[in-house]
């Protein structure tokens, strides 16, 4: 039974990101951008696209074709 507690602690430590490392939130943002029919643009959206969100805090934008 103690082994279960130890494995649980290692699982929690593995999933909690280190300070400055946003792997899990960044991946989730990209995933939700794709679900909404968008793509992650590096700097700006193209002329025929609109911004519907953000893919990261560093400036990547989630863009989708205008309706």
UniProtKB/Swiss-Prot annotation:
GO terms for cellular component: extracellular space. Pfam families: Defensin_beta. Disulfide bonds join 33-62, 40-55, 45-63. The keyword Disulfide bond applies. SUPFAM superfamilies: Defensin-like (SSF57392). Keywords: Antibiotic, Antimicrobial, Defensin, Disulfide bond, Secreted, Signal. Its main location: secreted. The keyword Secreted applies. GO terms for biological process: cell chemotaxis; defense response to bacterium. It is found in: Secreted. InterPro entries: Defensin_beta-like. One of its GO terms (molecular function) is chemoattractant activity. Residues 1-22 form the signal peptide. Belongs to the beta-defensin family. PANTHER family: BETA-DEFENSIN, BETA-DEFENSIN 103. Has antibacterial activity. This is Beta-defensin 14.
């Amino acid at each position: 039974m103690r082994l279960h507690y130890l494995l649980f602690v290692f699982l929690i430590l593995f999933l909690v990101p280190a300070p400055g490392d946003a792997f899990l939130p960044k991946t989730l943002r990209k995933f939700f951008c794709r679900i909404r029919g968008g793509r992650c643009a590096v700097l700006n959206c193209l002329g025929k696209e609109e911004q519907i969100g953000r893919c990261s805090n560093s400036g990547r934008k989630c863009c989708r074709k205008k309706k």
